[in-house]
């Protein structure tokens, strides 16, 4: 469902932001 897609996108977004913050 849509909520599952949003949840996956949220996890990916957090990981992506984490990588940006590290550098």
Swiss-Prot record:
Subcellular location, principal: secreted
Subcellular location(s) of the protein: Secreted
Tissue: Expressed by the skin glands.
GO BP term, example: defense response
Keyword Secreted: yes
Role description: Antimicrobial peptide.
Family: Belongs to the gastrin/cholecystokinin family. Magainin subfamily.
Name the record gives this protein: Magainin-BM2
Species of provenance: Xenopus boumbaensis
